[in-house]
C-alpha cells in the first residue's frame, strides 16, 4: 500500500465520489470540506453531496445519455449512484431521491471509510502533492483567486452564459439555409429566416415567457457584457433585429431577398451533430424556453440537448487546461473534477469525480492514468471538455451528440440511442476492474 495521501478539496458530488474511488483503491485521502465552518449562499447543511437545486438525477432509462452514464457508474461502483438508488423516490422514468437521506447516506459511506480523513476547514491555497480540486460552482473567493492565478485570467470564469443547443437531425433543413454573413469565409451557419409576422409572434412569446428567479448571489452576472435575449427584447423589438437576429448579409438563396430577421445556428461539436443558437443566452424557464424556440422556422420539432442558462458558476477553460484524465496539463498530480471542469449536472459532476479519483489513485500507485473512449458516456464527457473549441467553451450535459459516431447510420432515433447505449456499456465493462 502506498503511503502517499491524495488531497480532495470539496465534498460535493464530485469530491465525495473522487474520495471514495481513491479510498477503495487502498490510498489514503484527506477530504477537505469548509462547511459548516464556512457556508456557501446555496448550501444549508454540513452533509456531503448536498443537492442544492432539484432532487432529480434525471432520466434513468438507457434511451437517454444521462441514463447511460448512470449505468456506467453503477458498473464502476459509484458511491453517488449507489446512495441514489438506495434513497430513490417514485419519479416515473427518472431517478429522484430523498435529498436529506441521500446526502446522509453519501456522508456515511465516505466518512466511515478507513482510508478517508475529513478536514472541516477552508482551503485558500492549492496544496502540494496529489490533489483533486472539486470545489464546485460556488468556490470561495480566496481559492478562486488562487485558481485564477494558476490558470490565467482568460481561462477562469465566474458565470455561465450558454445558448441552447439542438440536435442537427431535428432541424427542418427545408426551412433553413447554409450561409455566412456577406458570404465571408466558408458557409458556416445554418440560418433560420423569419418574416415580419413570424418575428412578431416570436417576439411577443419571448417577452411574455417566464424566467428563472435570480438568486441574490447571481445578480451581478448580467452586468458583465452578456445580456439574456429576453432582456434585450424587453428594450424594444428592434433591439433583436439589430442585434443577434440581424438579417443583413444573409439573403435567402430560395427567394433572393433579405429576411426580416434571422436566427443563426453554429456547429457546436466536431462531428457536426449539434448546433447552438447564436446569441441566445437566456434565463427563461425550460418549458417556456422550448415553446419560444419552437416558434423559430426550422426548429418547430427541435430536440434541445442543452437549454440556455445564465447562472453563477465557477469553471475553467478545460480544453486549454486539462487532459481527458482530468489532470491539469502543467502539473501531473493536480486534477480537477465536477462542474468546475465544464461538465453540467449532478450525475456528470459525480462521473468526472469518479474518473479523476481513479486516476489520482493510479498516479500515486505508479500506474498509467486511464482515458475512457468517447464511445462511452463518461468518455464522451471527458472528450468534450478537453477537445472542444476552447474559444466558445461552455458547460455541457451528457447527450448522445457527444458520443463518437456510430459506425452505421441509424435513422430512427430510438434505435440509434439504443445502439449508442449498447456500445457504451459493452465498452465500459472493459474498465470495471481498473
Swiss-Prot record:
Belongs to the MnmG family. TrmFO subfamily. It is an enzyme of class 2 (transferase). GO terms for biological process: tRNA methylation; tRNA wobble uridine modification. It comes from the Bacteria. The keyword Iron does not apply. Keywords: Cytoplasm, FAD, Flavoprotein, Methyltransferase, NAD, NADP, Transferase, tRNA processing. It catalyses: uridine(54) in tRNA + (6R)-5,10-methylene-5,6,7,8-tetrahydrofolate + NADH + H(+) = 5-methyluridine(54) in tRNA + (6S)-5,6,7,8-tetrahydrofolate + NAD(+); uridine(54) in tRNA + (6R)-5,10-methylene-5,6,7,8-tetrahydrofolate + NADPH + H(+) = 5-methyluridine(54) in tRNA + (6S)-5,6,7,8-tetrahydrofolate + NADP(+). NCBIfam families: gid_trmFO, PRK05335.1. One of its GO terms (molecular function) is flavin adenine dinucleotide binding. PANTHER family: GLUCOSE INHIBITED DIVISION PROTEIN A, METHYLENETETRAHYDROFOLATE--TRNA-(URACIL-5-)-METHYLTRANSFERASE TRMFO. It is found in: Cytoplasm. FAD binds at residues 10-15. This is Methylenetetrahydrofolate--tRNA-(uracil-5-)-methyltransferase TrmFO. InterPro entries: FAD/NAD-bd_sf, MnmG-rel, MnmG-rel_CS, MnmG_N, TrmFO. Catalyzes the folate-dependent formation of 5-methyl-uridine at position 54 (M-5-U54) in all tRNAs. It comes from Bacillus anthracis. Its cofactor is FAD. It holds the Pfam family GIDA. Its EC number is 2.1.1.74.
Amino acid at each position: 500500500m502506498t503511503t502517499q495521501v491524495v488531497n480532495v478539496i470539496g465534498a460535493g458530488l464530485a469530491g465525495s465520489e473522487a474520495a471514495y474511488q481513491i479510498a477503495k483503491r487502498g490510498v489514503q485521502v484527506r477530504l477537505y470540506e469548509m462547511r459548516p465552518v464556512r457556508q456557501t449562499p446555496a448550501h444549508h447543511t454540513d452533509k456531503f453531496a448536498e443537492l442544492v437545486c432539484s432532487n432529480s438525477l434525471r432520466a434513468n432509462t438507457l434511451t437517454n445519455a444521462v441514463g447511460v452514464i448512470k449505468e456506467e457508474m453503477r458498473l464502476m461502483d459509484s458511491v453517488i449512484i449507489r446512495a441514489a438508488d438506495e434513497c430513490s423516490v417514485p419519479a416515473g422514468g427518472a431517478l429522484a431521491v430523498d435529498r436529506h437521506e441521500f446526502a446522509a447516506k453519501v456522508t456515511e459511506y465516505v466518512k466511515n471509510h478507513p482510508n478517508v480523513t475529513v478536514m472541516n476547514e477552508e482551503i485558500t491555497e492549492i496544496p502540494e502533492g496529489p490533489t483533486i480540486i472539486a470545489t464546485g460552482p460556488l468556490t470561495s473567493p480566496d481559492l478562486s483567486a488562487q485558481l485564477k492565478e494558476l490558470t490565467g485570467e482568460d481561462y477562469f470564469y465566474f458565470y455561465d452564459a450558454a445558448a441552447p443547443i439542438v440536435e442537427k437531425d431535428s432541424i427542418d433543413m427545408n426551412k433553413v439555409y447554409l450561409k455566412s454573413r456577406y458570404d465571408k469565409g466558408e458557409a458556416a451557419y445554418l440560418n433560420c429566416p423569419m418574416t415580419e409576422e413570424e418575428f412578431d409572434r416570436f417576439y411577443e412569446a419571448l417577452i411574455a415567457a417566464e424566467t428563472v428567479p435570480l438568486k441574490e448571489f447571481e445578480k451581478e452576472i448580467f452586468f458583465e457584457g452578456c445580456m439574456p435575449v429576453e432582456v434585450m427584447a424587453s428594450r424594444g423589438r428592434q433591439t433583436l433585429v439589430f442585434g443577434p437576429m440581424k438579417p443583413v448579409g444573409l439573403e435567402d438563396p430560395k427567394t433572393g431577398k433579405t429576411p426580416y430577421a434571422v436566427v443563426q445556428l453554429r456547429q457546436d461539436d466536431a462531428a457536426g451533430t449539434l448546433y447552438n443558437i447564436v446569441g441566445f443566452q437566456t434565463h427563461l424557464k425550460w418549458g417556456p424556453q422550448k415553446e419560444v424556440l419552437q416558434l423559430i422556422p426550422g426548429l418547430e420539432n427541435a430536440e434541445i440537448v442543452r437549454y440556455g442558462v445564465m447562472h453563477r458558476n465557477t469553471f475553467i477553460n478545460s480544453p486549454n487546461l486539462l487532459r481527458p484524465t482530468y489532470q491539469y496539463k502543467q502539473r501531473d498530480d493536480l486534477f480537477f473534477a465536477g462542474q468546475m471542469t465544464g461538465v453540467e449536472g449532478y450525475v456528470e459532476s459525480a462521473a468526472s469525480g469518479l474518473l479523476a479519483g481513479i486516476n489520482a489513485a493510479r498516479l500515486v500507485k505508479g500506474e498509467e492514468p486511464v482515458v475512457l473512449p468517447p464511445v462511452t458516456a463518461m468518455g464522451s464527457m471527458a472528450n468534450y471538455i478537453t477537445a472542444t473549441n476552447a474559444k466558445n467553451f461552455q458547460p455541457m450535459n451528457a447527450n448522445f451528440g457527444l458520443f463518437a459516431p456510430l459506425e452505421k447510420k441509424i435513422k430512427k432515433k430510438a434505435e440509434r440511442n439504443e445502439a449508442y447505449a449498447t456500445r457504451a456499456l459493452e465498452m465500459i465493462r472493459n474498465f470495471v476492474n481498473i
